[in-house]
Design a protein with these regions (language model features):
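Terminal alpha-helical segments
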Residues: 1-134
Length: 134
């Protein structure tokens, strides 16, 4: 892949990941934060799910830049991302694991309402997204 192709790929995946994150922030704002907690689980869950999806978009772009693709007909899982990221960037793996637990498990599935925890999940997602910033 040429440098120009890599740049175009970064721009495409970065823009899409940021679009997801902006949408997630809009949904989170609807959850009505009071003090250190959000008060509408529906919007918290939605926002966390969208933010996690944005993180996955960024990871897909990052792995494509490294010429890593899933096998045809295989569904990508957290294990796919973890096993490939661990070979490339251990710090990114820490951000991925943290964001996975906060955004996907605690936020999306459990509807955690603690604003500090959710912010940490969003921050970790942005650290991954910034890895493909053009």
């Amino acid at each position: 892949m040429s440098i120009n192709e890599q740049q175009l790929l970064k721009e495409e995946y970065y823009a899409e990941a940021v679009r997801y994150m902006n949408n997630a922030k809009e949904n989170l704002a609807k959850a009505k934060k009071e003090g250190k907690f959000y008060h509408d689980k529906k919007y918290v869950r939605t926002a966390c799910g969208i933010a996690y999806s944005g993180l996955l978009v960024a990871l897909d772009g990052f792995l494509r830049l490294k010429d890593i693709k899933p096998k045809p007909k295989d569904r990508k899982s957290i294990e796919f991302y973890q096993s490939n990221i661990t070979k490339i960037d251990k710090k990114m793996l820490d951000y991925l694991n943290s964001a996975y637990h906060i955004l996907h498990l605690s936020g999306y599935y459990d509807g955690i309402e603690n604003a500090t925890v959710i912010k940490e999940g969003f921050d970790n997602a942005y650290k991954i997204i910034d890895k493909i910033k053009p």
